[in-house]
A protein has these predicted regions:
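Active-site neighborhood of HAD-like aspartate-dependent phosphohydrolases
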Residues: 1-49
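Hydrophobic alpha-helical core bundles mediating ligand binding, dimerization, or RNAP-core interactions
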Residues: 25-29, 47-51, 71-72, 99-103, ...
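Structured helix-beta-strand junction loops
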Residues: 50, 122-123, 156, 179
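Short, acidic loop-to-helix structural element flanking the phosphoryl-transfer center
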Residues: 64, 68-69, 87-128
Length: 240
């Protein structure tokens, strides 16, 4: 019997872009941010990154909280950090909540559907490993009309551990037979490099970060590509 072939994808940032999040922020508070010489993209990235940092610190110290809750809580602090002296006088709670809601409106990247199809046509089973909740993440695929069975959507949120803790990847790796072909694919170098450390083969797409900053990571990627379809083709070729 031939070895089974699997690719586990990160979702948010890899399969899904942040454009809708940034656009939502711009729609809700863009003019207010502009009055402080702050762009929606700059604030959105800073807010999201600050939330990821606190989310990870909470997880590491065994006080795991859902990411969406952390994102909401960090809103006013982030505004202050980017130069708004009195954030609550500039933005209302209702506007904050509307900005948080925009995070649920993320859309699949161009090429994501083609990427999955290339892999499935080559006999791969496509999985997703996310720190987000399955309902929200599944909605990204459902709205785009892209097949992603719920049973193939894995969240480490319920385990009380967040990527890139190595313990977040090991249960997924353990689902597969030792001789199976097992890839992890992401547009975050911190994510895919951690997956490689537990035993996955690594595929990295530059579509989000552009610069992999490879010098600070101690793992080598077998596939690096600029688009999701090209990454999929590299995985197929590398598995022959």
């Amino acid at each position: 019997m031939a070895n089974q072939k699997h690719v586990v994808f990160d979702v948010v940032g890899t399969c899904v872009s942040f454009d809708a999040f940034y656009n939502g922020i711009d729609r809700v508070i863009g003019e207010k941010l502009a009055s402080k010489h702050i762009t929606a993209n700059a604030f959105g990235y800073t807010w999201m990154t600050a939330a990821e940092l606190e989310f990870t610190f909470l997880s590491v110290s065994e006080r795991h909280r859902p990411y969406k809750e952390v994102l909401r809580t960090l809103f006013y602090r982030t505004l202050f950090m980017v130069g708004v002296a009195e954030p609550r006088k500039l933005v209302t709670d209702e506007e904050r909540d509307a900005c948080v809601l925009a995070y649920s409106d993320l859309e699949l990247r161009p090429g994501a559907a083609e990427c999955f199809q290339v892999l499935r046509d080559a006999g791969f089973t496509v999985w997703c490993l996310t720190t987000g909740d399955v309902k929200r993440v599944g909605g990204y695929f459902e709205r785009a009309g892209v097949e992603m069975p719920l049973e193939n959507l894995i969240s480490c949120d319920g385990q009380g551990v967040a990527k890139p803790a190595l313990a977040a990847y090991r249960p997924t790796l353990a689902q597969f037979a030792p001789d199976d072909i097992k890839w992890f694919a992401a547009a975050h170098m911190w994510d895919v490099s951690a997956a490689v450390k537990v035993g996955f083969r690594g595929a990295y797409c530059t579509i989000y970060e552009q610069d992999p900053c490879a010098e600070i990571f101690d793992t080598k990627m077998e596939v690096i590509a600029d688009t999701l379809p090209d990454m999929a083709k590299g995985i197929v070729k590398g598995s022959l």
